Every structure is written in C-alpha cells, then in structure tokens.
Regions:
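Active-site proximal loop and beta-alpha junction motif in alpha/beta enzyme cores
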Residues: 1-16, 20-237
C-alpha cells in the first residue's frame, strides 16, 4: 500500500507516524483490509520507504497497528542552548545542561530537545520564525521538546510536545515520526532497555493526550497504538 501525507499548508511529509497509523486504523474499521486469517502482516510505501506494518486484531476491541520505521540516523548536535531555548520561548535554565539537542531520524529527521522537567515542556511558547531558523541550520524538520518527567512515570518514559513551523504545524498532539527517534536516542544512551516497549506521552498541553508505543531493538524501531474516529466527512474531487 502506498501512502502520502500532507500538512494543512500542502507540504508532503514522510516517515511512518501517526498519520499512517490512522490511515491503517481507518481502513481496518471500514472493512478495507482482508478480513480472514486474524492478524495481518502488510507493507507500506511512504516517501520511497517500504516498511512492514502489522495489524493486530483483538475480539471486541479496536485494532492495534505496529509500523516499522527506518533504522535510526543520528545527525547534527546543537550545542547553542541559548538559541534553542529562545526559539522555544524558554531560557537556558529550562533545558538540561548535560545533554544537547540533536537531530535524529527514523524516516523523518527531527530536533530532539531535552528539557529539565515537565513544567519546562509545558511552558514552551515557540517563536515560529526563530524556531524555523534553528531547524534549518540543524537540518531538522520539526522540534520534539521532551523531559524524562512523564505524567505516568510507572508506564511512560517521556513527556513531549512537537512543533513544526517548517511545514505549517503549530503543535501536534501525537507524532510517531518523532517518538521513534526519541526512543532510539534514549536506547542508544542506555536510557531505556533494549527489546522492550515503552510509552511516550504527548498532546497533554493541547488537551488531547496521546500515549505512543515505541519498541526499540537494535536498529529496529517500531511505533504503534490504537485510535478513535473523531470526525467523518465527504471530500468531493
């Protein structure tokens, strides 16, 4: 299955993220996928990448979709904490002193910015022009601000917000293409155990909390979850 994803300003984005996951969940709910044989193993093409997809069916419950992402690539490290903080409407004290921001990609390259705590993440009020400049200079598409201070510390590893002025997204409630790189970075640093599934929290600041499941096993990164239909309509072409 070939999928293409566009932001509200018409920018096409790649990577296996929540947009693709939502498409698979809708196709399953609408009966557009093969109904026989239980769980499904499929493949999707996004922006030239062909990657596995697994649809898990449980009786009486919404399906769960797991998608492989590309192997992680670790890009530019941004050590100018003052510039990053200012672009996010924060001060240097809101960011961690011992870990720099870095661009990481598992299909889409995003700048991962570590904050001291959840309050710092919630305080962010990005300046779109300044943040877009920081992202262009770093070679990143969007910005994933995170802390290791989740709402549910027993079940989650990070609390996050995602901003992407480069493609017209002020803030996103769930971003699988950023959660995958974040867990890849944490796993590479020993911050999460290998071959386990962890939860990344996002969307709380928007009143649309999301819990993104991510599995990291060496070079294999998978994101998954379920979802609900929140709107329906008709598009005339």
């Amino acid at each position: 299955m070939r999928l293409r994803s566009f932001t509200p300003i018409g920018a096409e984005v790649g990577g296996a993220g929540h947009n693709a996951l939502g498409a698979w969940l809708w196709m399953e709910a609408a009966g557009r996928l093969p109904s026989a044989g239980g769980d499904l193993g499929l493949r999707q093409e996004i922006a030239g990448q062909v990657l596995p997809v697994e649809v898990i069916r449980l009786a009486g419950e919404p399906a769960t979709v797991w998608m492989d992402q590309s192997p992680p690539r670790f890009g530019a490290v941004v050590r100018d904490r003052a510039a990053v903080a200012a672009a996010l409407g924060l001060t240097e004290d809101h960011l961690t002193a011992d870990e720099a921001a870095q661009v990481v990609s598992t299909g889409a390259g995003h700048l991962l910015v570590p904050a001291r705590n959840r309050a710092a993440v919630d305080r962010a009020a990005p300046d779109p022009a300044r943040l877009a400049l920081v992202l262009r200079q770093a070679g990143g598409e969007g910005c994933y601000l995170y802390s290791r201070d989740p709402v549910d510390p027993a079940g989650a590893v990070a609390y996050t917000r995602f901003f992407n002025p480069t493609v017209g997204i002020a803030e996103d409630p769930a971003t699988g293409t950023a959660a995958g790189p974040l867990v890849a970075r944490l796993a590479a640093a020993g911050g999460v155990p290998e071959k386990t599934t962890v939860i990344v929290e996002q969307g709380y600041a928007l009143g649309r909390p999301s819990r993104i499941r991510v599995s990291a096993s060496g070079q294999r990164i998978r994101v998954g979850g379920s979802g609900l239909v929140v709107a329906e309509g008709t598009l005339a072409v």
